[in-house]
Swiss-Prot record:
Protein modification: Each of the three conserved histidine residues contributes to TRAP phosphorylation. Phosphorylation is essential for TRAP activity. Phosphorylation of TRAP is activated by RAP and necessary for the induction of RNAIII gene expression but not for ongoing transcription. TRAP is dephosphorylated from the mid-exponential phase of growth, which is when agr is activated and AIP is produced. RIP acts by inhibiting TRAP phosphorylation.
This protein's name: Signal transduction protein TRAP
Family that this chain belongs to: Belongs to the TRAP family.
Keyword annotations: Membrane, Phosphoprotein, Virulence
Coiled-coil ranges per UniProt: none
Recorded name of the encoding gene: traP
Length: 167
């Protein structure tokens, strides 16, 4: 099964990993407070101590020139089956939105926080999608909140923006 491995750190540290491993498909982005690098592969990763997710639904390919939103969706053991079933069954007509590039639904290898990556041409086209009924009905905090479990989990749903690195 294909997996997505992610690590956060400084730009220089992560960029050195990328430079030293040209045979691996490593993608590096800038976040609000650090950099992130990830590798999507069925092989072993070069990343040390990454977060590991299984890719359970995918559309399109990753590209370092695109903007990404990573949505972290908390759940509990009691709700993961229903959450996963709902997210897998979502009609992927969102791919018809202007600027849409890619999508990944990810199951955690450890824990119960699922992750979704939406790739768009830029942040504005993602924000347009985020204001759509498709997003509000299927991917918003409100749409998914009954899969979170205890009320303390609600604050754990969050988005992290990944920006292309301009050198």
């Amino acid at each position: 099964m294909k997996k997505l491995y992610t690590s956060y750190g400084t730009y220089g540290f992560l960029n050195q990993i990328k430079i030293n491993n040209p045979s691996h498909h490593l993608f590096q982005f800038s976040t609000a407070d650090s950099s992130v690098i990830f590798e999507e592969t069925e092989e072993n990763t070069v990343l040390k101590s990454p977060s590991i997710y299984e890719v359970i639904k995918e559309i399109g390919a990753f590209n370092e020139d695109h903007f990404y939103c990573a949505i972290f969706i908390p759940s509990t053991e009691d709700h993961v089956y229903q959450l996963e079933k709902k997210l897998i069954s979502v009609d992927d007509n969102f791919k018809n939105f202007g600027g849409f590039k890619s999508y990944r639904l990810l199951r955690p290898v450890k824990g119960t926080t699922y992750k979704i990556y939406f790739g768009f041409a830029d942040r504005q086209t993602y924000e347009d999608f985020k204001n759509s009924d498709a997003f509000k009905d299927h991917f918003s905090k409100e749409a998914l909140s009954h899969y979170f479990g205890s009320s303390g989990q609600h604050s754990s749903y969050f988005e992290r923006y990944l920006y292309p690195i301009k050198e």
